[in-house]
């Protein structure tokens, strides 16, 4: 669990690497799962999806031009990440770190619905204190909900120049906002 949280912090702090989507076809996160999943199963027959994150700036509908899908093989105790853009894999590489990585639940809501839930919950608070620009959307299990560590969640990260980032955690099954904080 500690390794997974460390990975979450590293990834969420690395949102500065997010680039513009240029002319890529924008798509919600779930649309790339079949492509990445087929490659992951050829890499390891027991590969399980453990992490999804935008690789390029997410748009206002929860879409991005490129998404990363991290798979973990319990049999080999290895993780491999696939970056999907325009329906094909642009990059695939093994991660050289060891961590416990529980698979995300199968019934997760897509990125657009997660963003809608986060935006709706922010409502009046957003009018008083702007959230800034959406920089990252991360789907994972067991990283951002201490009360229910088995829960799959979306974590949305907004950045504002000169202010701490805003984090919004959305239950990936019910689309309910679980918590929001700045930090």
Language-model regions, residue ranges each:
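Gram-negative bacterial Sec-dependent N-terminal signal peptides
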Residues: 9-13
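Long, terminal "pre-/pro-" and other extracytoplasmic accessory regions
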Residues: 20-183
